[in-house]
Protein backbone atom coordinates (compact mmCIF):
# COMPACT_ATOMS: atom_id res chain seq x y z
CA UNK A 1 0.00 0.00 0.00
CA UNK A 2 2.84 2.36 0.85
CA UNK A 3 4.37 1.58 -2.55
CA UNK A 4 1.08 2.39 -4.29
CA UNK A 5 0.76 5.66 -2.33
CA UNK A 6 4.36 6.62 -3.08
CA UNK A 7 3.88 5.84 -6.77
CA UNK A 8 0.69 7.91 -6.93
CA UNK A 9 2.23 10.86 -5.08
CA UNK A 10 5.31 10.70 -7.29
CA UNK A 11 3.15 10.79 -10.41
CA UNK A 12 1.16 13.69 -8.97
CA UNK A 13 4.39 15.56 -8.29
CA UNK A 14 5.58 15.08 -11.85
CA UNK A 15 2.21 16.19 -13.24
CA UNK A 16 2.33 19.25 -11.00
CA UNK A 17 5.82 20.13 -12.27
CA UNK A 18 4.61 19.82 -15.87
CA UNK A 19 1.64 22.10 -15.19
CA UNK A 20 3.90 24.67 -13.50
CA UNK A 21 6.29 24.49 -16.45
CA UNK A 22 3.48 25.09 -18.94
CA UNK A 23 2.19 28.04 -16.91
CA UNK A 24 5.67 29.56 -16.74
CA UNK A 25 6.05 29.22 -20.51
CA UNK A 26 2.65 30.80 -21.08
CA UNK A 27 3.48 33.67 -18.74
CA UNK A 28 6.78 34.29 -20.54
CA UNK A 29 4.98 34.16 -23.89
CA UNK A 30 2.45 36.78 -22.74
CA UNK A 31 5.23 38.96 -21.31
CA UNK A 32 7.02 38.71 -24.66
CA UNK A 33 3.80 39.69 -26.45
CA UNK A 34 3.52 42.82 -24.31
CA UNK A 35 7.09 43.88 -25.09
CA UNK A 36 6.62 43.30 -28.82
CA UNK A 37 3.26 45.10 -28.77
CA UNK A 38 4.86 48.16 -27.19
CA UNK A 39 7.72 48.15 -29.71
CA UNK A 40 5.27 47.87 -32.62
CA UNK A 41 3.45 51.03 -31.51
CA UNK A 42 6.55 53.21 -31.51
CA UNK A 43 7.26 55.27 -34.62
CA UNK A 44 8.90 58.47 -35.83
CA UNK A 45 5.79 60.32 -34.66
CA UNK A 46 5.10 58.38 -31.48
CA UNK A 47 7.33 58.02 -28.43
CA UNK A 48 7.12 55.58 -25.54
CA UNK A 49 5.72 58.30 -23.26
CA UNK A 50 2.59 58.50 -25.42
CA UNK A 51 1.75 54.79 -25.10
CA UNK A 52 -1.05 53.72 -22.79
CA UNK A 53 -1.35 50.51 -20.82
CA UNK A 54 -4.72 49.75 -22.43
CA UNK A 55 -3.35 50.13 -25.96
CA UNK A 56 -0.39 47.87 -25.28
CA UNK A 57 -2.58 45.24 -23.59
CA UNK A 58 -5.10 45.30 -26.44
CA UNK A 59 -2.32 44.92 -29.03
CA UNK A 60 -0.94 41.96 -27.04
CA UNK A 61 -4.40 40.36 -26.89
CA UNK A 62 -4.88 40.45 -23.11
CA UNK A 63 -7.13 42.32 -20.68
CA UNK A 64 -5.62 45.53 -19.22
CA UNK A 65 -5.87 44.10 -15.71
CA UNK A 66 -3.73 41.12 -16.76
CA UNK A 67 -0.88 43.51 -17.57
CA UNK A 68 0.01 43.75 -13.87
CA UNK A 69 0.77 40.04 -13.69
CA UNK A 70 3.82 40.74 -15.84
CA UNK A 71 4.92 44.32 -15.06
CA UNK A 72 4.38 46.63 -12.09
CA UNK A 73 3.58 49.52 -14.42
CA UNK A 74 4.28 50.90 -17.89
CA UNK A 75 7.63 52.29 -16.76
CA UNK A 76 8.87 48.82 -15.84
CA UNK A 77 7.84 47.66 -19.31
CA UNK A 78 9.80 50.55 -20.82
CA UNK A 79 12.92 49.79 -18.81
CA UNK A 80 12.72 46.16 -19.95
CA UNK A 81 12.53 47.41 -23.54
CA UNK A 82 15.61 49.60 -23.05
CA UNK A 83 17.55 46.64 -21.63
CA UNK A 84 16.47 44.42 -24.52
CA UNK A 85 17.36 47.05 -27.14
CA UNK A 86 20.86 47.50 -25.73
CA UNK A 87 21.40 43.76 -25.41
CA UNK A 88 20.19 43.17 -28.98
CA UNK A 89 22.65 45.72 -30.33
CA UNK A 90 25.58 44.37 -28.31
CA UNK A 91 24.86 40.80 -29.42
CA UNK A 92 24.83 41.87 -33.07
CA UNK A 93 28.14 43.69 -32.70
CA UNK A 94 29.65 40.60 -31.08
CA UNK A 95 28.54 38.61 -34.11
CA UNK A 96 30.17 41.24 -36.32
CA UNK A 97 33.46 40.81 -34.48
CA UNK A 98 33.21 37.06 -35.03
CA UNK A 99 32.81 37.71 -38.77
CA UNK A 100 35.80 40.05 -38.65
CA UNK A 101 37.90 37.28 -37.10
CA UNK A 102 37.25 35.23 -40.25
CA UNK A 103 38.53 38.05 -42.46
CA UNK A 104 37.21 41.44 -43.50
CA UNK A 105 37.37 45.12 -42.66
CA UNK A 106 36.83 45.76 -38.96
CA UNK A 107 35.19 49.15 -39.39
CA UNK A 108 33.17 48.41 -42.53
CA UNK A 109 31.79 45.15 -41.14
CA UNK A 110 30.87 46.86 -37.86
CA UNK A 111 29.15 49.76 -39.64
CA UNK A 112 27.22 47.43 -41.95
CA UNK A 113 26.06 45.39 -38.95
CA UNK A 114 24.97 48.53 -37.11
CA UNK A 115 23.01 49.81 -40.10
CA UNK A 116 21.36 46.39 -40.43
CA UNK A 117 20.28 46.67 -36.80
CA UNK A 118 18.67 50.05 -37.47
CA UNK A 119 16.97 48.77 -40.61
CA UNK A 120 15.59 45.69 -38.86
CA UNK A 121 14.87 47.24 -35.44
CA UNK A 122 14.15 50.95 -35.99
CA UNK A 123 11.88 51.28 -32.98
CA UNK A 124 14.42 49.70 -30.64
CA UNK A 125 16.99 52.30 -31.68
CA UNK A 126 14.40 55.10 -31.51
CA UNK A 127 13.71 54.11 -27.92
CA UNK A 128 17.40 54.33 -26.98
CA UNK A 129 17.80 57.70 -28.69
CA UNK A 130 14.71 59.32 -27.22
CA UNK A 131 15.01 58.04 -23.68
CA UNK A 132 18.70 58.97 -23.59
CA UNK A 133 17.60 62.58 -23.14
CA UNK A 134 14.03 62.02 -21.95
CA UNK A 135 12.32 63.37 -18.85
CA UNK A 136 12.59 60.17 -16.79
CA UNK A 137 15.76 59.88 -14.71
CA UNK A 138 15.32 56.10 -14.51
CA UNK A 139 15.14 55.81 -18.30
CA UNK A 140 18.12 58.12 -18.83
CA UNK A 141 20.16 56.05 -16.39
CA UNK A 142 19.11 52.79 -18.09
CA UNK A 143 20.11 54.06 -21.55
CA UNK A 144 23.38 55.48 -20.22
CA UNK A 145 24.13 52.09 -18.67
CA UNK A 146 23.49 50.31 -21.99
CA UNK A 147 25.70 52.76 -23.88
CA UNK A 148 28.43 52.34 -21.28
CA UNK A 149 28.26 48.56 -21.74
CA UNK A 150 28.61 49.11 -25.48
CA UNK A 151 31.63 51.40 -24.99
CA UNK A 152 33.27 48.98 -22.54
CA UNK A 153 32.93 46.01 -24.91
CA UNK A 154 34.37 48.03 -27.79
CA UNK A 155 37.24 49.26 -25.60
CA UNK A 156 37.98 45.64 -24.61
CA UNK A 157 38.15 44.67 -28.27
CA UNK A 158 40.36 47.63 -29.23
CA UNK A 159 42.70 46.95 -26.31
CA UNK A 160 43.07 43.34 -27.38
CA UNK A 161 43.55 44.08 -31.08
CA UNK A 162 45.60 47.29 -30.98
CA UNK A 163 47.68 46.62 -27.85
CA UNK A 164 47.12 50.12 -26.50
CA UNK A 165 46.55 51.16 -22.86
CA UNK A 166 42.99 51.16 -21.53
CA UNK A 167 42.84 54.95 -21.29
CA UNK A 168 43.43 55.24 -25.04
CA UNK A 169 40.99 52.51 -26.06
CA UNK A 170 38.23 53.88 -23.81
CA UNK A 171 38.62 57.37 -25.28
CA UNK A 172 38.61 55.93 -28.80
CA UNK A 173 35.59 53.71 -28.08
CA UNK A 174 33.62 56.61 -26.58
CA UNK A 175 34.32 58.83 -29.61
CA UNK A 176 33.32 56.03 -31.98
CA UNK A 177 30.07 55.23 -30.17
CA UNK A 178 29.12 58.93 -30.07
CA UNK A 179 29.56 59.26 -33.83
CA UNK A 180 27.84 55.95 -34.54
CA UNK A 181 24.74 56.90 -32.52
CA UNK A 182 24.61 60.29 -34.25
CA UNK A 183 24.76 58.62 -37.68
CA UNK A 184 22.16 56.11 -36.56
CA UNK A 185 19.75 58.91 -35.70
CA UNK A 186 20.15 60.29 -39.23
CA UNK A 187 19.75 56.85 -40.82
CA UNK A 188 16.42 56.05 -39.15
CA UNK A 189 14.09 57.73 -41.62
CA UNK A 190 16.00 58.04 -44.89
CA UNK A 191 15.96 56.10 -48.15
CA UNK A 192 18.32 53.34 -49.24
CA UNK A 193 20.68 55.63 -51.18
CA UNK A 194 20.93 58.19 -48.38
CA UNK A 195 21.61 55.42 -45.87
CA UNK A 196 24.38 54.08 -48.12
CA UNK A 197 25.96 57.55 -48.22
CA UNK A 198 25.69 57.82 -44.44
CA UNK A 199 27.35 54.43 -44.14
CA UNK A 200 30.30 55.54 -46.30
CA UNK A 201 30.67 58.76 -44.33
CA UNK A 202 30.58 56.87 -41.05
CA UNK A 203 33.25 54.41 -42.24
CA UNK A 204 35.50 57.37 -43.14
CA UNK A 205 34.92 59.11 -39.80
CA UNK A 206 35.64 55.97 -37.79
CA UNK A 207 38.81 55.32 -39.76
CA UNK A 208 39.96 58.86 -39.01
CA UNK A 209 39.33 58.32 -35.29
CA UNK A 210 41.15 54.99 -35.40
CA UNK A 211 44.18 56.44 -37.19
CA UNK A 212 44.19 59.48 -34.92
CA UNK A 213 44.11 57.33 -31.78
CA UNK A 214 46.98 55.19 -33.05
CA UNK A 215 49.19 58.12 -34.01
CA UNK A 216 48.41 59.97 -30.78
CA UNK A 217 49.44 56.89 -28.84
CA UNK A 218 52.69 56.64 -30.86
CA UNK A 219 53.35 60.32 -30.19
CA UNK A 220 52.88 59.83 -26.45
CA UNK A 221 55.21 56.82 -26.57
CA UNK A 222 57.88 58.86 -28.34
CA UNK A 223 57.53 61.67 -25.80
CA UNK A 224 58.27 59.32 -22.92
CA UNK A 225 61.40 58.14 -24.72
CA UNK A 226 62.76 61.70 -25.02
CA UNK A 227 64.11 63.90 -22.23
CA UNK A 228 61.29 66.15 -20.95
CA UNK A 229 61.49 69.64 -22.37
CA UNK A 230 62.84 68.58 -25.76
CA UNK A 231 59.42 67.99 -27.31
CA UNK A 232 57.13 70.86 -28.18
CA UNK A 233 53.50 70.15 -27.32
CA UNK A 234 51.20 70.66 -30.30
UniProtKB/Swiss-Prot annotation:
GO terms for biological process: fatty acid biosynthetic process; negative regulation of DNA-templated transcription; negative regulation of fatty acid biosynthetic process. One of its GO terms (molecular function) is DNA binding. The keyword Acetylation does not apply. Residues 29-89 form the HTH tetR-type domain. SUPFAM superfamilies: Homeodomain-like. Probably part of the fabR-yijD operon. Has been suggested to require either an unsaturated acyl carrier protein or unsaturated acyl-CoA (but not their saturated equivalents) for DNA-binding. Another group suggests that unsaturated thioesters are not essential but act instead to enhance DNA-binding. Binds the promoter region of at least fabA and fabB, but probably not yqfA. Represses the transcription of fabA and fabB, involved in unsaturated fatty acid (UFA) biosynthesis. By controlling UFA production, FabR directly influences the physical properties of the membrane bilayer. This is HTH-type transcriptional repressor FabR. Its main location: cytoplasm. Pfam families: TetR_C_46 (PF21943), TetR_N (PF00440). The lineage of its organism: Bacteria, Pseudomonadati, Pseudomonadota, Gammaproteobacteria, Enterobacterales. One of its GO terms (cellular component) is cytoplasm. Residues 52-71 bind DNA. Homodimer. The keyword Cell membrane does not apply. Disruption phenotype: Significantly increased levels of unsaturated fatty acids (UFA). Double fadR-fabR deletions have increased levels of saturated fatty acids, suggesting a functional fadR gene is required for fabR function. Increased transcription of fabA and fabB. It is found in: Cytoplasm. InterPro entries: DesT_TetR_C, Homeodomain-like_sf, HTH_TetR, HTH_transcr_repressor_FabR, Tscrpt_reg_HTH_FabR. It comes from Escherichia coli (strain K12).
Amino acid sequence: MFILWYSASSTFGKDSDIVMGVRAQQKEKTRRSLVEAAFSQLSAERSFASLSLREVAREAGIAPTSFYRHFRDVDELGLTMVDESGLMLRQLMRQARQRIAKGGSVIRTSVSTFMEFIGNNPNAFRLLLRERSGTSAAFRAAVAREIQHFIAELADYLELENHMPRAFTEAQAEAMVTIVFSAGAEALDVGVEQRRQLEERLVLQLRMISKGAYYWYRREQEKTAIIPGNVKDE
